[in-house]
Structure formats: C-alpha cells, structure tokens
Amino acid sequence: MTTKPHNPANVLLQDAKTGKLPESEGTLVLKEVIKNSAVMQLAKFEDMGGKPVKKFTFLAKGPGAYWVSEAERIQTSKMEWKQATMETKKLGVIIPFSKEFLKYSVQDFMQMAAPLIAEAFYRAFDQAVLFGTESPWGEDKSIFKIAEAKQKVITEGTGKNLYHDMVSLLALVEADEHDPNGLLTSRAFKSKMRNVVDNNGYPMFDPNSNQILTLPISYASKQIIDKEKALALIGDWDYARYGVLQDIEYAVSTDAQLSTIEGADGKPVNLFEQDMFAL
C-alpha cells in the first residue's frame, strides 16, 4: 500500500515537520538567491547533472592561424585544455519563528518564509566565495585570497586618483590575457565611483546603464563586502561557475536551543522556553 504525498496547500506545517519545499516556493527561493547574489549575477551557471561532483574540460587557449606560402608546411596549432572540478556542499540556514506559524499551511508558510531563506542563502554563499567566510572549501580558495596570493591587488591611492587605480586594476586582469567583464562592490562605493573621471574630465560611471569603464556592476550588501579587505573586485567572471545539486529540504524543531542565534537578552534562543520553533 502506498501513501500519497501530501498537498502542501492543505497540510499544516505542524503536521508536516520535515519534507521538501513545495516546487513553486523552492523555485522562488532559488530565483531570489540568483537575483540577489552579487557573485551569481556575474558568474555562469553550471548544470551539475544531479551529481555532487562534476568535472568538465574548458578551453584555456584556442587554436592559432598561420600565414603560409605555396608548398610550405602548415604549422600544427596547439590548443590548451584544462579540467575543472566542481564539488557541492550542503548550505543550511536556521530561522526562528513564533509557534503561531505552525498553524499555517506548508505552502502559505513557505511563501512567507521564502525571502528570509533566500537572503540567508545568498549572503552565506557570497561571503564564502568572496572572502572565505565559514567556507567549507577553506579561506584560501576565496576570490580575495587567491587575488592576494597572486599579487593581483591595487591599494586605493596608489595612482593619481581612483580612475588611475581602476585602470591599473584592469591591467592586472589583462596581464594574464583575460578580458575584465564585471565589477563587484558595495553600494557605499557608489559615491566614489561618481567622482571617477578620465584624463579629459569625462565621468566614467554611468548610473543609467549601471556601468563603470564599460564594466557592468554587481552590488553586494553591506554584510557581505569586507571593506577592510577589498572595496571592489574586477575580473573575467566567465571563469566563475556555480551549480545547484537538488531541491531544498526543511525540518521543523520545537525543543532545541539555538547556540548560534541570540535573543534580546544576549543569550542563546531556547525554543521551548520562548514558545518558538526553528525552521
């Protein structure tokens, strides 16, 4: 005898404490993550094919062409291929709610919670990718740490003005035969970009097209950008890839103490004592 899957629109959350986010809400969460993640706006999506580890080959250096005379042997063209490995890691979030929400249908509750889930996801993702914050791959694999290790860093004020600093930053990317195609920064950096002018006094920041030096700009929230480390990052984002392995699963707990979340009194939240539950 088989059990029919429950309809999330008709089942209360208190009666379905574990499961997968309904398809519509799961899609909504992923769309919100992709739309708001500063990294994902610039990087390319890679289909994981339902596998936790994916290896793929990409062309690092293309074939060349040569001028030849009659009866002259055509040179052999060499192409450089490299292999990349993508490995998925589980990304989890804990959000406390008042117990009244247990009386919502699963679908209604998830519609309400979707923006909160998405924000927690894209914030954790961007922090890990950019600066290695709590990254399962380690801090050394972050974009900032790799750029720092390869001395691809320009300190603000090195040049005559910010325009010259940014041009120098572009040159660091181009030195490795890459085309810079995006700038990632915080909205607080906008005021500085408005003052960027070229040697002829023309502004380089176009707020209408959201570009500077013809580069599209992706803004990260203030909780993501560590201004002590970097004000802006420029690169060839075609080489940045991300993927998603599976649907989003959830579980409800009513008797746990949340060691990573503090209440107004500065103490860890105790769900049972405070009549709350955690998703």
Pin down the residues of each PLM region.
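Active-site scaffold segments
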Residues: 117, 276-279
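Extended oligomerization regions of viral-like shell subunits
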Residues: 152-277
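Short, Φ-rich (hydrophobic/aromatic) sequence segments
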Residues: 20, 24-34, 38, 109-113, ...
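Bulky hydrophobic/aromatic "packing anchor" residues in well-ordered structure
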Residues: 55-56, 95, 217, 279
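Assembly/oligomerization interface modules of large self-assembling protein complexes
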Residues: 3, 13-93, 162
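Short helix/loop capping segments that flank catalytic or ligand/cofactor-binding pockets
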Residues: 63-67, 105, 192-195, 242
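Active-site-surrounding "flap" and adjacent substrate/cofactor-binding loops of secreted or lumenal enzymes
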Residues: 9
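Alpha-helical scaffold segments that mediate packing/assembly in large oligomeric complexes
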Residues: 82-85, 92-172
